[in-house]
Structures are given as C-alpha cells and as structure tokens.
Amino acid sequence: MKGFLKPNFSLGALFLTLSPIATACIAEKPVNNRFNFNSEQLARLRKARVNHWRDGDTLEVSFANNHQKPIRIYAIDTPEKAVLSIQRKSEIELKEANKATEFAKSLIPIGSEVWIWPLNSYSYDREVAAVFFKTNPLQLHFESFAVEMVANGHALPIAGNDFDFVFSDLDPFNPLKIVGIELANGLNNAFNNRKNIFSYLENSFQSITMVYQQRGVDQSWTRYLAPSNDFSSTKLGLGLTIYELKLNNG
C-alpha cells in the first residue's frame, strides 16, 4: 500500500504544533465486530489454519491441501519489529510491535481456524488478504482480525491510494467495503481513549509519530477519524473521511 508519511515529512512537523486539546472529546460510535456474509461473499473465503505469527500484521497459514502461505493482513499496519534503520531505531516501536504480536497470538492462537479473503496481490513473499475468525466455532457470524487490532490500539487502519473508491468504484466484494466503517469506529475508540500506540507524548496524534519510526506513517489512517476530529483527513485537507464517503455514496 502506498501513501506513507515519513517521520521527518513537513506535514508531520505541522501537525505536532497543533494543540493537544484538539484531540479531546471527539464523538465515537461503539464497535460492532460481527459480520454476516452472503453466499457470494462466503465464496471468497478460504478456510486455513494458523501456523505462525511473524508479527501483528503477518501470519503464516496452511490450507486444506497442506499448502502453506504467509499472509499480509489487508488494511492495517502494526509497528515494525525489524530494525530497518539504526538512525530510526525506536525502543517504543519495538515494544508496541511485540505487544501487537502477543495480542494477535492471544486473539487467534496457533492451530486456530481462520478464513482468508485474498486480494489477488502480494507484498514481498506475502499474499495480501483480509483475515476473519470465530471466537466460538458454533457462531454464525465472523469477526474481523483487523477491526479487533485497531479497536485495541495495536494497529492503524490504512487504505493506500484506493480509499476514494471504497464506496463507489472499488470492487463491491473488497472486504474494506464491508469492514471499513467498523475499522473507523475502532480507530476513534482507541484514539480517544489513548490505547497502546496512542498512549505516548501529549496527545494521540503525536504518539503515532513517536511509535512509527522505522517506515513512517501511512497518512491514509487519518481518513478513518471522525470528520470533527482536528486531525482527520477532512480537517487536514487530505480528502474525505470514510464516514463522509459512505454518506455520499450510500
């Protein structure tokens, strides 16, 4: 996914000058991480079993034919475990990366069943896909791994360059069209309550610039914030938020 905002990018310096009060008291909606798919959507899912968690947004699974594959989870980004640049090495980022990995392992332990929704694209050796799971094997609804990670402050929701098409020209079976609003609800909950990656520095936005040091921040995460939030993409002139796109496109 594209659209990364490097730690020393000029917009980042501008955002840091904004008042901490700007992040307070933004309305949020409860997160509903329950999804019921129709027959066409169910046909997109591939059942798999979790073999290993590389980090909070990458896992390795095996399918019924015993074929094994690494999966890069679509639409989220967790802090980086690998040290890509000594100059940008951050103990805080490593701490949050490890917390994200451990949360993923506790949410979906090794050996658990998951349902993979492939996007027919790759990131290095990893197939990009949405991941769904069931807390109870008897339940009919599915839960989104991405929504759970974001709502608990372990990941940022991202959309790259496709965001403007989420509620218009994007493939109607793209999982982001289904889970996008709940990703936004989860983000606003974590942001307002300063959970994990949002718990550093003077406010939640500044905290992100502190945590995501290795690769910078994909600025599309601001498009999931409530329009009234002073750090939302609408207020910063980076495009409409997902709430506004849904309102405009149904």
Swiss-Prot record:
Domain of life per record: Bacteria
Keywords: Cell membrane, Endonuclease, Hydrolase, Lipoprotein, Membrane, Nuclease, Palmitate, Signal
Covalent lipid adducts (N-palmitoyl cysteine), residues: C25
A GO term, aspect molecular function: endonuclease activity
Record membrane topology: Lipid-anchor
InterPro entries hit by this protein: SNase_OB-fold_sf, Staphylococal_nuclease_OB-fold, Thermonucl_AS
UniProt main location, coarse: membrane
Cellular-component GO terms for this entry: plasma membrane
Lipid-bearing positions (S-diacylglycerol cysteine): C25
Compartments, record wording: Cell membrane
Signal peptide annotation: 1-24
Domain TNase-like: 44-200
Spans through the membrane: none
UniProt-recorded name of the protein: Uncharacterized lipoprotein MG186
